[in-house]
A protein has these predicted regions:
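Conserved GTP-binding G-domain of TRAFAC-class P-loop NTPases and closely related GTPase folds
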Residues: 142-268
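N-terminal pre-Walker A segment at the start of P-loop NTPase domains
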Residues: 1-26
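Conserved glycine(s) of the Walker
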Residues: 42
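Phosphate-binding P-loop
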Residues: 22-30, 97-98
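Hydrophobic positions on the alpha1 helix immediately C-terminal to the Walker A/P-loop
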Residues: 46
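Conserved phosphate-donor/acceptor-positioning beta-strand/loop module used by diverse small-molecule
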Residues: 122-145
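The conserved Walker
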Residues: 38-39
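Conserved nucleotide-sensing/catalytic segment adjacent to the nucleotide-binding pocket
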Residues: 54-55, 60-119
Length: 268
């Protein structure tokens, strides 16, 4: 594939660092915000509401890299080398933010890295805040497909995450049988580990600006109060997206939605 030369990569990295830190000011007590959730769960939206913080997102780096190369992100060009380079750039942004004692928002779907970061940053005087994005897995899946049809690259990330961790099984949160799961297996496991390690956390329902649960709240009451989406509404939305994909000649999107509908019908 087309790629930047070594000196061009250095220029690109410096530009990304400068853009990430632009307009941000140091903090006497800097905070590291870790945002956790599957693709399509609203992490980027929540990140945009946190003031005066350097956002670290490999997905954003990859998108900017594609623009620099003049590649259409719809072609899903990302390969392993691009992913590694995005990690290198993200690390440079992180080091610059820490050096300047700036607040940091860590936006990622790579869950295994998050605990490492939460353990690492306090050494540099950072307090940590863990924010979990709770979203119905079918809602997230359709968000991702819709974003792909809006020329976003999220579909491939979502597919990779689901292939790695698989579909959730059972009913871990005690949901009613006519509704779909509210967390993926990966995020659920992450939450359990976070609690075991003693990390205070906040849980956000999709589309809400304020947390629905904070450490110390009654978790059972939180579960009872969740605003679940009936399967019928998922199926209605899926049909609309299928028609849109069909009319646009997007065969891959159409087949993805067909498979999603089949699974929803089986769980209805």
């Amino acid at each position: 594939m087309i790629e930047l030369a070594e000196d061009e990569r250095q220029v690109f990295t410096e530009r990304m660092v400068a853009e990430a830190l632009k307009g941000k000011t140091p903090s006497e007590s800097p905070t590291f915000y870790a945002l956790v959730g599957a693709p399509g769960s609203g992490k980027s939206t929540l990140a945009s509401t946190i003031d005066n913080a350097v956002v670290i997102s490999s997905d954003h780096v990859i998108a900017e890299y594609a623009k620099t190369l003049g590649i259409d992100i719809r072609e899903d060009f990302c390969d392993r080398e691009v992913g590694r380079f995005a990690t290198v750039v993200s690390n440079e942004i992180y080091k610059a933010a820490v050096k300047n004692k700036m607040n940091i928002v860590y936006d990622t779907s790579v869950l295994q890295n998050t605990f490492k970061m939460l353990e690492h940053v306090p050494k540099f005087g950072y307090q940590t805040k863990l924010k979990i994005m709770l979203v119905d897995e079918y809602q997230a899946a359709m968000n991702v497909v819709e974003r792909k049809m809006d020329n976003d690259d999220a579909f491939s990330r979502h597919r990779q995450l689901r292939e790695k961790f698989g579909y959730p099984s059972g009913n871990p949160l005690g949901m009613k049988p006519s509704t779909s799961m509210n967390v993926s297996a990966a995020v659920e496991e992450f939450v359990m580990q976070a609690v075991e390690r003693g990390y205070p956390l906040e849980i956000y329902e999709f589309g809400k600006k304020e947390p629905s649960f904070k450490t110390g709240d009654d978790f059972d009451r939180f579960i009872e109060s969740l605003e679940l989406i009936p399967m019928e509404r998922h199926l209605e939305r899926c049909e609309k997206l299928k028609r849109r994909a069909d009319n646009a000649g997007r065969e891959e999107d159409f087949m993805q939605l067909m498979a999603l509908k089949k699974e929803m019908m089986e769980r209805k």
